[in-house]
Amino acid sequence: MLGILNKMFDPTKRALNKYEKIANDIDAVRGDYENLSDEALKHKTAEFKERLEKGETTDDLLVEAFAVVREASRRVTGMFPFKVQLMGGIALHEGNISEMKTGEGKTLTSTLPVYLNALTGKGVHVVTVNEYLASRDAQQMGEIFAFLGLTVGLNLNSMSKDEKREAYAADITYSTNNELGFDYLRDNMVLYKEQMVQRPLHFAVIDEVDSILVDEARTPLIISGQAQKSTKLYVQANAFVRTLKKDQDYTYDVKTKGVQLTEEGMTKAEKTFGIDNLFDVKNVALNHHINQALKAHAAMQKDVDYVVEDGQVVIVDSFTGRLMKGRRYSEGLHQAIEAKEGLEIQNESMTLATITFQNYFRMYEKLAGMTGTAKTEEEEFRNIYNMQVVSIPTNQPVIRDDRPDLIYRSMEGKFKAVAEDVAQRYMTGQPVLVGTVAVETSELISKLLKNKGIPHQVLNAKNHEREAQIIEEAGQKGAVTIATNMAGRGTDIKLGEGVKELGGLAVVGTERHESRRIDNQLRGRSGRQGDPGITQFYLSMEDELMRRFGAERTMAMLDRFGMDDSTPIQSKMVSRAVESSQKRVEGNNFDSRKQLLQYDDVLRQQREVIYKQRFEVIDSENLRDIVEGMIKSSLERAIAAYTPKEELPEEWNLDGLVELVNSTYLDEGALEKSDIFGKEPDEMHEMIMDRIMTKYNEKEENFGTEQMREFEKVIVLRAVDSKWMDHIDAMDQLRQGIHLRAYAQTNPLREYQMEGFAMFEHMIESIEDEVAKFVMKAEIESNLEREEVVQGQTTAHQPQDGDEAKQAKKAPVRKVVDIGRNAPCHCGSGKKYKNCCGRTE
């Protein structure tokens, strides 16, 4: 009954029927375009753009646009997309995944929706897994687009910012997923809008979509730099704070745990460090270190707030009294306590920006993908990316012979059988592709074949260009190729002369992967475009997957039958058990990726807020209103802390409030206790705010409006960037320890969301306080440069070669871009990183 219902309501079947009708319409107008001259065909692009401007949609133009690309492709490359390729292209245009078997021409299929969507002028990104494929496709398919008058850009890791900007400005941009993600992060660290390279994310077509959105979904892209806080500064600040006297040099409020330098304390600091003004923009880092050292000495008590254990500072939970191992105070307070206790100061490298592929690609207005194998991950694509998987039929029926698995007792017996099978096929001249799960297996089989004197090539997914070349030759007579799973993906194996008569390409699998999709990819290497072929998997009871579903029982059964190591069994029961084991593993992997996304969504929402506001800052001409708003909020919180509602007015610490207001917003003696005595908090706020605004206006008059506007930008950008980087670090530490909350019968995700939100709120307050303090206290130098914004903190540089970190079997791998000290600085100053943003003192 269920089967009948599935047939009636199968969404793929419905979609295919719809696509076939549209493909027939495209076929019907074929003759009209064949008769057009080259010029008339090229002119169609301008005509389509005009019609879009007049209100037509890309859907309205689909039939004509596809017919134009089809004809242009025939004239330029000699390739004419088949009807099934038209159907694949329509699926892509609708933001779905086209599952097209190997050799069915996915690259050519993509040109159809890419052209149609590029007509909008918003830019289309074609995403591939490596730079070799991006370069190859940009060159080959770029000819079709160039013929039709569209521009094509290629975005590579080695390019300068100007070259990248040009590549992104093109109608169509070919790039790798890594480069797109890193460019997005770097764009949100620039100081001037003109330094950004990407345009808003419009439409992306991802080749090998399962590899990028599933296999690499858990891989965070990370831009990191040396931790901005110099160890030396912590030690110096600590030594200085030890010389200060309470109430004379600093004040401490027990209730709020607030510590503040008095005017005397500030003068002492300026003398000790040989500077004119502690609040000058260039002394931001020093000021921060002194504040944290003060807090460490005055507010943080040993054995109350923290303990020292095994040379480490361990935080004590103030509610439960438990030790919170692995957690560190943020904003450099932890390092300040380490300096106070005379311990080694841990100065890890710092995460400056991070995003996962899942969240990067979900930002596109429309997303589509192509692969030979996506059906097994259909649920994941639907739930996480809202994309349907549409299996496109092959142009010619598949006549490949997929043989049942051969199961051996031991690995040794299995590998001997594989070598024997390869040797026999080699003797007849039939080409063989041996697929392995791990590099060690490739090397072991290579050794066995060497012993038999069989020449062969080994591929380990390291050199993409060489790889593509070897894979192309893997279908020639007598070729033997050993490849790990991902090697040579994206390149077709075309059969050489006389190979069809020998049975086509033989694919030999040496074990089942935990994902059926990877097994299907290996099978799909053979039997392309109706060619003959054969696939055979060899398994052993010692394989990891076999051990998972209880191979012991089967082993005992084999023993009873007295089977030796050289005799295989072919059993449907075992094959079914393997498949159900694979389904279980796939389910677990999906759950873990889904969970990662739920955690990552917390940071995603925060990232979007910060990046949006940061862009508004660099895009805005005048930040005065924003800064005034920040000062208001900061002052409101300060007044609320010193005038709590639950206390009587005579209990309020007005002396503390006056000290704070004068040292943070005004000048020594500008506010007296008598000015605010007897007033309500909102009256105090209004009066103090008036005085602050008077000082603000005087400052603007002295320095000139233009200089003041740039100064505000410098202060706001520096505060946002440094606090956001601290926040990313703190969120990372929270994330690493949060699973332990499950032991306390709480939901770790819920706790992470709540604490993450509280930390974000605190970060926003912290930004407002810092902006208020520095705008009011810092002096403006006449030659103010926005680059000063990053002094004392690191920003990013280009990713280094080889950052395509391979996914480990279980744990997520981090893709990290580190900054070389002698590399040119990212901020565009032209100086070396170590002499510019990487300067730590």
UniProtKB/Swiss-Prot annotation:
Topology versus the membrane: Peripheral membrane protein
Cofactor: Zn(2+)
Entry keyword set: ATP-binding, Cell membrane, Cytoplasm, Membrane, Metal-binding, Nucleotide-binding, Protein transport, Translocase, Translocation, Transport, Zinc
Region feature Disordered, mapped onto this chain: 786-812
GO biological process, one term: protein transport by the Sec complex
Entry EC no(s): 7.4.2.8
Signal peptide start-end: none
UniProt-listed InterPro entries: Helicase_ATP-bd, Helicase_C-like, P-loop_NTPase, SEC_C_motif, SecA, SecA_CS, SecA_DEAD, SecA_motor_DEAD
Annotated binding of ATP, by residue: 85, 103-107, 492
CDD domains named among the record's database cross-references: DEXDc_SecA, SF2_C_secA
Top-level taxon: Bacteria
Binding sites annotated in the UniProt record for Zn(2+): 825, 827, 836-837
Catalytic reaction list: ATP + H2O + cellular proteinSide 1 = ADP + phosphate + cellular proteinSide 2
Subunit organization: Monomer and homodimer. Part of the essential Sec protein translocation apparatus which comprises SecA, SecYEG and auxiliary proteins SecDF. Other proteins may also be involved.
Family classification: Belongs to the SecA family.
Role played: Part of the Sec protein translocase complex. Interacts with the SecYEG preprotein conducting channel. Has a central role in coupling the hydrolysis of ATP to the transfer of proteins into and across the cell membrane, serving as an ATP-driven molecular motor driving the stepwise translocation of polypeptide chains across the membrane.
Protein name per UniProt: Protein translocase subunit SecA
Taxonomic placement: Bacteria, Bacillati, Bacillota, Bacilli, Bacillales
